[in-house]
């Protein structure tokens, strides 16, 4: 089926969303045009406002429309803890755990094949933030448990070796409530390597 230029433009725009392929984009576009034009208009307005009004927090680099995000603006947070994550969605995930320290958001992970070195993801800014703040005693490396995430965490830990900080890595392994037979070998190996004694 061939679509008019405006419909094709809408479909192509919707395909830029993660996980949205050709068929899904077509369904979304036709749904908005045929059944929910007011919803489509609200979506367009919200998207336009977000694209022009949302930037990055000057301290942690997460997404916000203010100079400081809510976490950086909160004086009750623990200034001795700094959690390093790969992206803004990770901040929201860590917040669900009750973590009350500060954040630094990288722009992804090290990936030399994709041209993403330390400068591209903001590691020099991370080091500068640690040195300028001067209150951190522990840096928690909460990068994803992928090869690239592990390499990024290792690189940062090496950089911070002589800074007088505790550098820790979030644990990962068998999920709570998971069954061993369903866990992949790499995850299980990590779980065995990171095993801890049972405190009685």
Curated annotation (Swiss-Prot):
GO BP term, example: DNA recombination
An example Gene Ontology molecular-function term: zinc ion binding
Protein name: Recombination protein RecR
Pfam families listed in its UniProt record: RecR_C, RecR_HhH, RecR_ZnF, Toprim_4
SMART domains in the cross-refs: TOPRIM
Similarity-based family: Belongs to the RecR family.
Record keywords, A-Z: DNA damage, DNA recombination, DNA repair, Metal-binding, Zinc, Zinc-finger
Domain annotation Toprim: ranges: 80-175
Annotated zinc fingers (C4-type), start-end: 57-72
Function field: May play a role in DNA repair. It seems to be involved in an RecBC-independent recombinational process of DNA repair. It may act with RecF and RecO.
PROSITE patterns per record: RECR, TOPRIM
Record gene name: recR
NCBIfam families given in the database record: recR
């Amino acid at each position: 089926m061939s679509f008019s230029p405006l419909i094709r433009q809408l479909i192509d725009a919707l395909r830029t969303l993660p996980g949205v392929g050709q068929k899904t984009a077509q369904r979304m576009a036709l749904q908005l045009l045929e059944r929910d034009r007011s919803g489509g208009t609200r979506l367009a307005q919200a998207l336009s406002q977000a694209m022009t009004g949302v930037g990055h927090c000057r301290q942690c680099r997460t997404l916000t429309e203010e100079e400081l995000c809510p976490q950086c603006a909160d004086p009750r947070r623990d200034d001795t803890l700094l959690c390093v994550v790969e992206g803004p969605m990770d901040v929201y995930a860590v917040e669900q755990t009750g973590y009350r320290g500060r954040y630094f958001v990288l722009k992804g992970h090290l990936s030399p094949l994709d041209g993403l070195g330390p400068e591209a993801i903001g590691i020099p800014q991370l080091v500068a933030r640690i040195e300028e703040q001067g209150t951190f005693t522990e840096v928690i490396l909460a990068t994803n448990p992928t090869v690239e995430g592990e390499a990024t965490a290792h690189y940062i830990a090496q950089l911070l070796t002589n800074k007088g900080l505790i550098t820790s890595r979030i644990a990962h392994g068998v999920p709570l409530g998971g069954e061993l037979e369903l866990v992949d070998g790499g995850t299980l190996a990590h779980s065995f390597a990171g095993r801890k004694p049972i405190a009685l």
